Amino acid sequence: MDYSYDEDLDELCPVCGDKVSGYHYGLLTCESCKGFFKRTVQNNKHYTCTESQSCKIDKTLRKRCPFCRFQKCLTVGMRLEAVRADRMRGGRNKFGPMYKRDRALKQQKKAQIRANGFKLETGPPMGVPPPPPPPPDYMLPPGLHVPEPKGLASGPPAGPLGDFGAPALPMAVPSTNGPLAGYLYPAFPGRAIKSEYPEPYASPPQPGPPYGYPEPFSGGPGVPELILQLLQLEPDEDQVRARIIGCLQEPAKGRPDQPASFNLLCRMADQTFISIVDWARRCMVFKELEVADQMTLLQNCWSELLVFDHIYRQVQHGKEGSTLLVTGQEVELTTVAAQAGSLLHGLVLRAQELVLQMHALQLDRQEFVCLKFLILFSLDVKFLNNHSLVKDAQEKANTALLDYTLCHYPHCGDKFQQLLLCLVEVRALSMQAKEYLYHKHLGNEMPRNNLLIEMLQAKQT
């Protein structure tokens, strides 16, 4: 749905620089980019770029490369789910609260400009400095190994990490008897790790959930109820770390000639994902869905949730020259540069750039849990039995995040939009990571019984 716009604010389309005509699909854009985005989504068009996928898009050149134009539409924040699938006029009215608040902010901004006698100019987002350049090189430390917390034995020595090629992966609708079945409901056939207690972990002495949960967060004024509930669902990080380290101490079931460091990273990712599945099972709305819908949602976003979990850990870590693993171990980026191939190294550096961007945005825990919820309830997923419930969850999370950012970061009026743009980059990173894993699998380099590979294969069947 299009919303009226104050022309005297004189903003330019973030895609091509043409004059803005109104709010279209979640963003202020021109009429041309509005129509282009709508036609692309409704007709399910797929473009290719004849150059290097970095074509300049402006008012005069916007029709030369539809691939780069559509990518820019997504990058600046146009929303796929706002386009109606039935080709009727008018978009899906899910961004009404955002439009109204955004308009109020712009009216306030216009009044300040008139009062101060300044001319409104387009520029970088308010309160968000540009990310610094990639970190410099550092001295190489010893290789990757399992840490030794609380008396656990040390892990095997490190080995080199490999390289890969990266063609696109096919995407398909998952089935209900895939790799997640045994995690969501233990009665379903699946792998050995069940929904409550993963097999490599010893049963706790007293009954209870697999992970400890913090005390309810009071939050103070301006914290929406949804975010308060999500904060209570977050598992205790120390317990998650201890469980994953304990699992890594178990004898590996993979190929014995595999590089130890790569095997460990795969097993870390597996166990991290299991903790994410446990979190999802406890989420409001998600636990109300049928098992088939639960599996569809998780199989759609598992890689994004893993990437976002890693990114937020680095934001908390706060060190540009190293990466903090889920086990609590620091790995210098130059270790990756020395042991990994150029493509994997590029993926790590790209992730680091996103970390710097989120750090500049001052991403906090309240925003993290809400964004994670938004990733889980993506409206891009098709063939859901209860799409309306997922849509309602997405709308409530969007509203909660917008209200929170406006209340707690009034000096950054566009923080809500900038956070959603970060999710676009999270998705791009997750696709690149899946391509890396898949080609490791094709090269017979992945550990056996790897859950992530099973997730990839479920996408293709």
UniProtKB/Swiss-Prot annotation:
Q: Where does the record place Pro residues bias?
A: 126-139
Covalent cross-link Glycyl lysine isopeptide (Lys-Gly) (interchain with G-Cter in SUMO), where: 119, 194
Q: Which residues bind a 1,2-diacyl-sn-glycero-3-phosphocholine?
A: 341, 436, 440
Q: Which SMART domains match?
A: HOLI, ZnF_C4
Which terms under GO biological process does the entry name? female gonad development; hormone-mediated signaling pathway; male gonad development; positive regulation of gene expression; regulation of transcription by RNA polymerase II; sex determination; tissue development
Modification Phosphoserine, positions: 203
Question: Which parts of the chain span the membrane according to its record?
Answer: none
Modified residue N6-acetyllysine is at which positions? 34, 38, 72
Protein purpose: Transcriptional activator. Seems to be essential for sexual differentiation and formation of the primary steroidogenic tissues. Binds to the Ad4 site found in the promoter region of steroidogenic P450 genes such as CYP11A, CYP11B and CYP21B. Also regulates the AMH/Muellerian inhibiting substance gene as well as the AHCH and STAR genes. 5'-YCAAGGYC-3' and 5'-RRAGGTCA-3' are the consensus sequences for the recognition by NR5A1. The SFPQ-NONO-NR5A1 complex binds to the CYP17 promoter and regulates basal and cAMP-dependent transcriptional activity.
UniProt protein name? Steroidogenic factor 1
Organism equals: Equus caballus
